[in-house]
């Protein structure tokens, strides 16, 4: 496989081939509902002046550029605007102030690759074989290149498309962003890598430009930030989609400058086994804070580059996490964390800014999840879903632009050993213990007051709804 060399200049193109080939809840607080999540956290400068979301009806604009940014294993309350007591995230807080902050946004799953499947396809992870892996850990499965994606559908509607950062939807030679609708790719294929050496879970080198290895041993977050900043400043001749997928603050717990710790992890990786990269004996609250704040600065740099380009007004920027937080994450008041279908494993921070169409200083308590953004961005970009692959998400364009309140519906999740379904304020949950539980999230975000005995009919109804959806999905393969 050819090896490409790095160039530290951020002015270089993302690839060497030419790029470009090719909704308010009504105004009343009662309609939106007081954002219980926001109320649970102490007021901050960011949230004090927020108003319940109201669509700015009657505005018009061209199709937006789309900058879709993901953090990796970032917890729901790890941003200061979501209640973190010590982590400071001024750039992401500002992004939220400039648009709308969502208190009840969810990932499509509780781990990395299933959520990415749900975002890229707009469907439950269990619709596809690759989505059953939680997460993808080898070369046996991935996102089928024949399956339509957010990128392929937008590209068909005239968008330029690029993915920078973590892919985690399958490995070469069978799977790649360039096989699934993205014109350009720069990043890593696997679920994690050491931030300096770029060694992945199996000790393989995992930094690529397109489908060729790319040599750059600088700190990974810096490289991704440079690449994304260059991309958004290009003189594009068509609207564009950039999926910017940071690996921060996913383990290993390495901040920029931690070269000695990096070398020790590399030594362990080369000795064999997964322990080195998992970094179970490393990290700290202070190190996690450092990584999250670096993520915030990096997003800020990309947003400054976007502003310099003159495209800020017509660019929809969305930021979220791919799932709930990991071991050092701040989750209060939620229970659970990554891999669990408790709120702490699937509820994520999410903010959206689109100056041309969305007013600033707003907050929404509308329950939504990753596949909804697929449907929404397709509609805003003038693309239609493939009828052979019906979406499980709903478009929020009517809500965001015209104030159309979505009908009450079910949000569904499934991971091995757990199940969950949310309808309105009610959540049905069955954990590894096997007991069916029922929680009213409006009063009990922490999922401690089990209402299953008090509301047996509702429990039965939500359980049946979960089982109907589950029956239409692929079964998990039997454990070997």
Residue ranges and their predicted role:
Residues 2-5, 11-34, 41-436, 441-480:
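Formylglycine-dependent sulfatase
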